[in-house]
Structures are given as C-alpha cells and as structure tokens.
C-alpha cells in the first residue's frame, strides 16, 4: 500500500481547534516535512489549494501558500518522492496548467502529477469575480471533462484544437512535453466525481470514515471499482486519514479528546454554511462529509487514534479493503508525527514490510 503525506499548505493543518498546534504555512516547514517523509520512504506528497479560509478564533485556513509554486520548490529539494500539486480549475486555464506541470516535471525528473478540483467553496471565487453562477454546481464535471481533455492533448501531442462548451483551443501549443506520462488525480465521492475519475484519473482520493473504523470507507472504494470497471480502466482509491498516535491507546485518546474540546465553533459554522450552498450535486459530495458534526474538528477525515501498534494494525486493515491502493496521511503535529510514523508505526505494518532499511536521518 502506498503512503502519502497531505502537506499543511494552510495554517494549522487539518485540526480546527484552539487546542491544536497553531502555526503558519511556510516553505521551510513544508520542506522539512517532505524531506522527512522521503527519508521514511513515503511514496508521495500532495498539497491542496485553498483561496479563502473559515475564519474563527483560529483563522482556520485564512493563511495559505499556493500549490504549484510550493510543489515546484519541494520538487527541487527532493529526489525520490512523487510530488502532486492541486489545480483550482476555475482559476487557471488548462494550457497554463499543462505548461506549469511540464516545468515541474523537468524540475523533479519525472516525479510530478496534478490533482484537479472543480471548486466547492463559492466565496473563494466570488472574491475574485470569477464564480460562474450556481448552475456550475451541476455542470462542474462537464467543465472538468473538457479541461482534462485539453491537458491530455497538450501533454500527449504538444498541440490542441479542442472545441467544447467551455474551452476553445486554436492550434494551442505546449513544449517541451513531460518526460513521462503525467498522472492526473481527483477526489470525487459523488457519482459524477467517480464517473469522471473512472474515465480520466489515474487514482481517486476519498475520505476515510469515523474514528478507529479503518474499513468503513469500503463501500466508497467499491463504488469506485464499479465505476472503473464500466470504463475498462484500473483506478484505485487512496484514502485520507489523520493519525494521532502515542505510546498507549489512552494517551492518544486523551490528545484527541483535548483537540475536540477546543473545537473552533465559529470556523466550523462557516464550513457548515458553505456545505449547504450546493443544492444541485446530491448528498454524497466531499464537502457534505467535511461538515458532518460527527468529527468536524478535523473535517471528518477518517481518524486513527491509538498506540503505535494499534495504528499500524488499523492501517493494515485499510490495506485489506478491495480497491484501496494507498493512504494520504495528516498528523496533529506533522514533523514529530512523520518521525514517529517512520520509526514506530511503519515497521509494524505488514503492508509496508517490503521497504528497505532506513539510512541516516535527514537533517
């Protein structure tokens, strides 16, 4: 099973709590995180894109770096780990994304890929005057389908004459082309999102579910497998989890309860409000899960809370789910969390037993 790190491009990572570590996103922090992840044989690093935060006492995600420029910098200071940036497709023409991706392919020596997102938080785009109207909620995957076709044309042949409802290319050129086939990833949980991934993505991200219920996402992975079978493609699921680990189950649980007790209710209210804006995409979208009150303090990603042995066992359970090809991990404290994962958790995981021995620790 592949392991990736979801780097904290926004302030405070993924804990919406006054009791969680409070920090700003910087290149130096993310450089240290990704170099440490590479040292511990993580397979990939992904950054999101967020253009407006949730506010509240913690100013959650009010402070964000930009994904492509951050990952270009990280590509230059790593050598093995795969690097993925996220394109907010309403903000960037596909021909520009194609050229930026080809540039980072050159920087990284063929280790780069692109995560495509349609955009769900209306204020991110209204503030710039580029929100296309609420009809977009129901047409966003039509838009993304045209977008990715332009990308594939330009990466594959260096030229596009695509004509569609959203994009018109007239002998559009991009050169040099990527040195290896460019991977495209998506994070669709709705039927429309999974249908898109089944046709165009190399793999699909989905949320884990619940606390210490590592296989609860299995129905989502099964839906993705079924969608991919209909297109004749192999599109695996990569599952998002937060790891909160300590020497004992009780110690880890105490940390989790402490974070929940400090939940930033004002920021969470903003998330809930935004999740209700899309009345056209159904009830199975990512943002609906993010705003579920069950575990909103970490946007309802699956949460693994326990001793190092308990977390290792639960991750092996994740690997046993049909269609689950990888996990994307976040941590309450990224630097210490990755080190603890590499030293204390990963060596206990049967699904990672193939890894070579560690070299000297990264500085």
UniProtKB/Swiss-Prot annotation:
Q: What keywords does the record list, in alphabetical order?
A: Flavoprotein, FMN, Monooxygenase, NADP, Oxidoreductase
As for family, the record states: Belongs to the NtaA/SnaA/DszA monooxygenase family. RutA subfamily.
The UniProt entry's GO biological process terms, in alphabetical order, are:
alkanesulfonate catabolic process; nitrogen utilization; uracil catabolic process
Kindly indicate where the leader peptide sits in this chain. none
Domain of life from the UniProt record: Bacteria
Q: What species was this sequence derived from?
A: Escherichia coli (strain ATCC 33849 / DSM 4235 / NCIMB 12045 / K12 / DH1)
Upregulating conditions = Up-regulated by the nitrogen regulatory protein C (NtrC also called GlnG) and repressed by RutR.
Question: Gene3D superfamilies under this entry?
Answer: Luciferase-like domain (3.20.20.30)
The answer to keyword Transit peptide applying to this record is: no
| Residues that bind FMN | 49-50, 115, 124, 140-141, 190
Q: Name one GO molecular function term.
A: uracil oxygenase activity
Keyword hit for NADP:
yes
Any one Pfam family match given in the protein's UniProt record, by short name: Bac_luciferase
The protein in question is named Pyrimidine monooxygenase RutA
Q: What is its EC number?
A: 1.14.99.46
Q: Which reaction does it catalyse?
A: uracil + FMNH2 + NADH + O2 = (Z)-3-ureidoacrylate + FMN + NAD(+) + H2O + H(+); thymine + FMNH2 + NADH + O2 = (Z)-2-methylureidoacrylate + FMN + NAD(+) + H2O + H(+)
Matches recorded under PANTHER family: ALKANESULFONATE MONOOXYGENASE, ALKANESULFONATE MONOOXYGENASE-RELATED
Function in brief:
The FMN-N(5)-oxide reacts spontaneously with NADH to produce FMN. Requires the flavin reductase RutF to regenerate FMN in vivo.
């Amino acid at each position: 099973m592949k392991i990736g790190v979801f780097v904290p491009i926004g302030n405070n990572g993924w804990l919406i709590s006054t009791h969680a570590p409070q920090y700003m996103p910087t290149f130096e922090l993310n450089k240290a995180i990704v170099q440490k992840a590479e040292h511990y044989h993580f397979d990939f690093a992904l950054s999101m894109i967020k253009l407006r935060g949730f506010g509240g006492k913690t100013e959650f995600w009010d402070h964000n770096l930009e994904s492509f420029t951050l990952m270009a910098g990280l590509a230059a200071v790593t050598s093995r780990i795969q690097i993925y940036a996220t394109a907010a497709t309403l903000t960037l023409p596909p021909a520009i994304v194609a050229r930026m991706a080809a540039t980072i392919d050159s920087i990284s020596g063929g280790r780069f890929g692109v995560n495509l997102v349609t955009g769900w938080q209306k204020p991110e785009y209204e503030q710039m005057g580029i929100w296309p109207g609420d009809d977009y909620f129901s047409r966003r995957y039509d838009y993304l389908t045209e977008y990715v076709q332009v990308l594939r044309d330009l990466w594959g042949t260096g030229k596009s004459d695509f004509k569609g409802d959203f994009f018109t290319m007239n002998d559009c050129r991009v050169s040099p082309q990527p040195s290896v086939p460019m991977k495209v990833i998506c994070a669709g949980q709705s039927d429309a999102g999974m249908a898109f991934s089944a046709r165009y993505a190399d793999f699909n991200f989905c949320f884990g579910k619940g606390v210490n219920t590592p296989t609860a996402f299995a129905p989502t992975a099964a839906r993705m497998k079924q969608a991919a079978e209909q297109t004749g493609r192999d599109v695996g699921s990569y599952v998002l989890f937060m790891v909160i680990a300590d020497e004992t189950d009780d110690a880890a649980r105490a940390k989790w309860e402490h974070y929940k007790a400090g939940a930033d209710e004002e920021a969470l209210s903003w998330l809930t409000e935004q999740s209700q804006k899309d009345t056209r995409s159904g009830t199975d979208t990512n943002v609906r899960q993010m705003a579920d009150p069950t575990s909103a303090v970490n946007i309802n990603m699956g949460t693994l809370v326990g001793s190092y042995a308990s977390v290792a066992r639960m991750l092996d359970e994740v690997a046993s789910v049909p269609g689950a090809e990888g996990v994307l991990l976040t941590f309450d404290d990224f630097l210490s969390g990755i080190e603890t994962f590499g030293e204390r958790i990963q060596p206990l995981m049967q699904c990672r037993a193939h890894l070579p021995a560690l070299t000297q620790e990264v500085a």
